[in-house]
């Protein structure tokens, strides 16, 4: 069992996404330990990219600012290495394929392992086209986590169930990331459809912004993923007190 899948064994997993270097590296290094202290089980470190197709305005803006700050995959690896000394929860990179491919798949995976990263999510890489990076990840002892959406076919679900390690990322709705007031009424049926095939833990993301939503989704999933709301709170409150309060509320809603 990997460190990532192990994070689902004792309780509903709370997974937090942040963009590395937003609004600056110093904040990232303060924010991640704070997230762990207040109940996060897995941290997703977003690698900024100039064309984040799966992301809504909040993460797009965070990615743009991080790029303006000079954040590259190399910088993200350095930040992860620093965080490894500060936290005990698993770290997962989330990033688009192009920067990782350009960096070098084998080198990237090896450096991830050295930096203490346990796996990664590449939202624009279908599992049927992931053989090269899957091989490099396996050699480095990393999990590669694939996504499914409500529109996914039974064939795609079977493929992801065969390929994904650590957990499966279930997208709550078609479209892009971003906090939303209403999540699909048939979300539970989607999760249950995947569960008939998959053995991995199932975590739901895209649109979760309140403890009430988290509590409802946790009734039929193994974990929840929150990102845009965290970045919004970071933007409005540099002290990070609002983020800490929000994460504690999410943790309480899941326990």
Swiss-Prot record:
> Which is one Gene Ontology cellular component term of this protein?
cytosol
What this protein catalyses is: (1S,2R)-1-C-(indol-3-yl)glycerol 3-phosphate + L-serine = D-glyceraldehyde 3-phosphate + L-tryptophan + H2O
Q: Which Pfam families match?
A: Trp_syntA (PF00290)
- Cited PROSITE patterns: TRP_SYNTHASE_ALPHA
Asked if Transferase is a keyword of the record, the answer is no
PANTHER family found in the cross-reference section: TRYPTOPHAN SYNTHASE ALPHA CHAIN, CHLOROPLASTIC, TRYPTOPHAN SYNTHASE, ALPHA CHAIN
User: HAMAP family from the entry?
Assistant: Trp_synth_alpha (MF_00131)
This chain's function reads: The alpha subunit is responsible for the aldol cleavage of indoleglycerol phosphate to indole and glyceraldehyde 3-phosphate.
Spell out the protein name for this chain.
Answer: Tryptophan synthase alpha chain
This chain's source organism reads Dehalococcoides mccartyi (strain ATCC BAA-2266 / KCTC 15142 / 195) (Dehalococcoides ethenogenes (strain 195))
């Amino acid at each position: 069992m990997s460190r990532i899948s192990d994070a689902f064994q004792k309780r509903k997993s709370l997974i937090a996404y942040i963009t590395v270097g937003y609004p600056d590296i110093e904040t990232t290094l303060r924010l991640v330990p704070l997230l762990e202290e207040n109940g996060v089980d897995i941290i997703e470190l977003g690698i900024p990219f100039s064309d984040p197709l799966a992301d809504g305005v909040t993460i797009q803006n965070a990615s743009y600012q991080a790029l303006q700050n000079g954040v590259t995959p190399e910088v993200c690896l350095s930040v992860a290495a620093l965080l490894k000394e500060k936290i005990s929860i698993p770290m997962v990179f989330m990033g688009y394929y192009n920067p990782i491919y350009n960096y070098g798949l084998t080198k990237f995976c090896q450096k991830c392992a050295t930096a203490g990263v346990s796996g990664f999510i590449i939202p624009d890489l279908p599992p049927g086209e992931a053989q090269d990076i899957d091989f490099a990840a396996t050699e480095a002892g990393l999990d590669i986590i694939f996504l499914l959406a409500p529109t996914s076919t039974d064939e795609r679900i079977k493929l992801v169930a065969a390929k994904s390690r650590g957990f499966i990322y279930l997208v709550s709705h078609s479209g892009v990331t971003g906090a939303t007031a209403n999540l699909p009424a048939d979300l539970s049926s989607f999760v249950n459809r995947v569960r008939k095939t998959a053995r991995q833990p199932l975590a739901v993301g895209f649109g979760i912004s309140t403890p009430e939503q988290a509590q409802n989704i946790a009734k039929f999933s193994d974990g929840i993923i929150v990102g845009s709301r965290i970045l919004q709170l970071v933007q409005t409150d540099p002290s990070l007190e609002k983020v800490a309060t929000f994460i504690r509320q999410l943790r309480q809603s899941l326990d």
